[in-house]
Amino acid sequence: MFFHGTSRVNGKGHLEIGGVDTVELANLYGTPLFVYDVALIRERAKDFKQAFADEGVQAQVAYASKAFSCIAMFQLAEELGLSLDVVSGGELYTAQQAGVSMERIHFHGNNKSRAEIEMAVEAGIGCFVVDNFYELDLLADICEQKRATANILLRITPGVEAHTHDYISTGQEDSKFGFDLVSGQATLAVKKALAVDSIHLLGVHSHIGSQIFETTGFVMAVEKIFEHLVTWREDHGFEPSVLNLGGGFGIRYIEGDTPRPVGDYVKEMIRAVKQQIAEHEMSMPEIWIEPGRSLVGDAGTTLYTIGSRKEIPNVRHYLSVDGGMSDNLRPALYQAEYEGALANRVNEQPVGMFSVAGKCCESGDMLIWDLPLPEANHEDILAVFCTGAYGYSMANNYNRIPRPPVVFVEDGDAQLVIQRERYEDLVRLDMPLVKKVKV
């Protein structure tokens, strides 16, 4: 069994995270329950920042907040000196409520609405990552109306395919995101952006995908980007002050996953950039990256209570838990795989393979297939590891199931940062049927 961060087995044979007994957490807050190891998040943030310091380059590390968003998480990111990557008005509003410095906000998204752009311009955010011509024109119009200026990066698709799931690949030419380099879209976008007085083009952004273990794709993306940067300098006098290379750094979910230390990704990126800078006699831009999963993914653990069991002789043994695709959509959406253990009996040896089923009314609601476990009983607490990214963020109310609470743990203390939804919350926005009165 592989433990992440501060996770360990305590004297009671229980899983402990951040110095807190997870069985006690389950008893106190109920299940399902998300538990975040804050010390591990701090360590990862420090590793990314130190990696850039070791390379001697100016950099911004922006937390990709779609991985997990809430007021407390945004406040922690600010405390750690991270910028914040948001992709919606809702995430921007959460950042405002958290008291985050707006100058550290980078606003992404392939279809920002007029209302969202106006909200961001009025808030004075640090940078828009412009995804398409529609947005470029809309932003220019809004800035003109409000007599404001906006810093932007142009998101480009470098034509690099990361070795990952199709749904989380974004750097190839056939993608809903960004300006294509090959067709000339990106060149036209640079020309248009430079012609607008209210827009300040800082540089370009590239993101090739997610859950990436190799550095080759990042290096190839840098090389392709600089091929065009050289041309843009010659033809348009544009040289970037910022180069954003995105995120996508992989983590270990299951045995066989082989992520690199974060310093390896940074080192290879910077090496590639410095090589291009020297070759083309350009100035070194500030480097931005956007880790999300790699900051919070393996810091999160979900606790469930085991309920019903079903055994099909010589076929499969099912264990059903009190959560499922309503709190972790990734197995159904991406065929994502996870590891787990009985939090209340961690040291006991497995007796067989069990498949963990969620409680939603869907045959595809399976959290884990073939998990080695001891003989599991009703009311045992199952811990599923590495659920810190895209678990709560994708949580939903399918089957009218309330979303779970979230607890931060550190140095023996636990803090509730998101309350459990109640049934009352599920109908709070509902309106009753109005019956027409017959005359």
Curated annotation (Swiss-Prot):
EC number(s) per entry: 4.1.1.20
Taxonomic classification: Bacteria, Bacillati, Bacillota, Bacilli, Bacillales
The name this protein goes by in its record: Diaminopimelate decarboxylase
Organism: Halalkalibacterium halodurans (strain ATCC BAA-125 / DSM 18197 / FERM 7344 / JCM 9153 / C-125) (Bacillus halodurans)
Protein family according to the UniProt entry: Belongs to the Orn/Lys/Arg decarboxylase class-II family. LysA subfamily.
Active site: 361 (proton donor)
Record keywords: Amino-acid biosynthesis, Decarboxylase, Lyase, Lysine biosynthesis, Pyridoxal phosphate
Highest taxon of source: Bacteria
GO biological process: lysine biosynthetic process via diaminopimelate
Gene Ontology molecular function, alphabetical: diaminopimelate decarboxylase activity; pyridoxal phosphate binding
